[in-house]
């Protein structure tokens, strides 16, 4: 038995024959199955997916758009989600019991989502309650596990995306005096600062030391940030910005708010994946842009806008490795197992977790 087989069950591993198929043959089979299944099959794809996968998506979008699509689609029996695990979980929780959600590769996870597990979160909430009493409301970025969404749901909180973070943080402060923001400290910090909350009124909870890190007066803390981050956006630096300013002084810099505060502050624009796409789309021909977000998306934007000069803010960036787990062979494999009635990699969230998580999701969806 190989090391991989010990880590991943053999039945969820891609069969050998898919490695030897030509791209043309795989694409032909995907088209055949899509045509055969019609509206009973729905393939949502995240913007960070590879082109070889996105070309077959029935809907492409960011986390908010895909959550809305999942919630509104009642016709498809099979939803083959081309994204990462937490997105497929969200789709399962927002669809009916008769609909089946499949993730083509179960290894497509999210390191940020894994930075906040439920045991750590329950322990943190208990300790923070000792400090602040019943003055807190939890918000979680949708880039989190179903269990964390459920935690927020049963504690009066909600989910957020990078598209609606300002709206949801503003709402949270109408409910409680303080906010606990999971699991991405950078999105939480950038959003709160953008709403006028000074940095010295923000603290960071370290789940590994069970300690609160802060510089100002503890009584004045308004935002408690979970010490988590996106492994992709963490790699954009102020030095990258300085290099662009030096070598291309007329180039606009636009970044995702999962980048650290210093990078966002030094950029010209910051916003969600959809915001970045729309901004470049509406920019005049001949304009110049350095984009600080995932590389698959940056490359796609470059291809779609040959009339504009577009580069990655960090020229040495790699695509999101876990997003890249979903590829054409895994997509075809998932579709062929459906065709045979032998579905693999079915995502099924526990009923109680779903009920509580949907509370958090609906508090978001009804406000956007």
Curated annotation (Swiss-Prot):
UniProt xrefs under Pfam families: NadA
Cofactor: record remark? Binds 1 [4Fe-4S] cluster per subunit.
Q: Which residues bind [4Fe-4S] cluster?
A: 110, 230, 320
Drop me one GO molecular function for this one.
Answer: metal ion binding
Required co-factors: [4Fe-4S] cluster
The record's listing under InterPro entries reads:
NadA, NadA_sf, Quinolinate_synth_A_type3
- Location in the cell: Cytoplasm
- HAMAP family given in the database record: NadA_type3
Q: What family does the entry list? A: Belongs to the quinolinate synthase family. Type 3 subfamily.
What is the name attached to this protein's record? Quinolinate synthase
């Amino acid at each position: 038995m190989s090391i991989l087989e010990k880590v991943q069950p053999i039945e969820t591993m891609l069969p050998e024959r898919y490695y030897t198929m030509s791209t043309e043959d795989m694409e032909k089979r995907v088209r055949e199955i899509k045509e055969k299944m019609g509206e009973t099959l729905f393939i949502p794809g995240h913007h960070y997916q590879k082109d070889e996968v996105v070309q077959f998506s029935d809907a492409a979008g960011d986390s908010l758009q895909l959550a809305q699509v999942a919630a509104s689609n009642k016709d498809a029996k099979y939803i083959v989600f081309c994204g990462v695990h937490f997105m497929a979980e969200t789709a399962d929780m927002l669809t009916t019991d008769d609909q089946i959600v499949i993730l083509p590769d179960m290894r497509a996870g999210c390191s940020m989502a894994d930075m906040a597990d439920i045991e750590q979160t329950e322990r943190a909430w208990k300790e923070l309650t000792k400090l602040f009493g019943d003055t807190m409301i939890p918000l979680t970025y949708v880039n989190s596990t179903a269990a964390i969404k459920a935690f927020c749901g049963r504690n009066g909180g909600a989910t957020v995306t990078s598209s609606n973070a300002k709206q949801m943080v503003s709402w949270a402060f109408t409910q409680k005096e303080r906010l606990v923001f999971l699991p991405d400290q950078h999105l939480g910090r950038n959003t709160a600062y953008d709403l006028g909350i000074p940095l010295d009124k923000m603290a960071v909870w370290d789940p590994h030391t069970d300690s609160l890190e802060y510089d100002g007066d503890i009584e004045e803390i308004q935002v408690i940030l979970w010490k988590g981050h996106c492994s992709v956006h963490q790699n954009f630096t102020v030095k990258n910005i300085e290099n662009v300013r030096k070598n291309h002084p007329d180039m606009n810099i636009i970044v995702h708010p999962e980048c650290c505060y210093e990078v966002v502050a030094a950029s010209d624009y910051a916003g969600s994946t959809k915001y970045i796409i729309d901004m470049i789309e509406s920019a005049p021909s001949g304009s110049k842009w350095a984009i600080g977000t995932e590389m698959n998306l940056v490359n796609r934007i470059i291809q779609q806008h040959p009339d504009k000069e577009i580069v990655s803010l960090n020229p040495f960036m790699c695509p999101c490795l876990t997003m890249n787990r979903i590829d054409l062979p895994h997509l075809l494999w998932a579709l062929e197992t459906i065709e045979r009635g032998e579905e693999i990699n079915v995502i099924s969230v526990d009923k109680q977790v779903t009920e509580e998580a949907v509370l958090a999701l609906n508090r978001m969806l009804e406000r956007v």
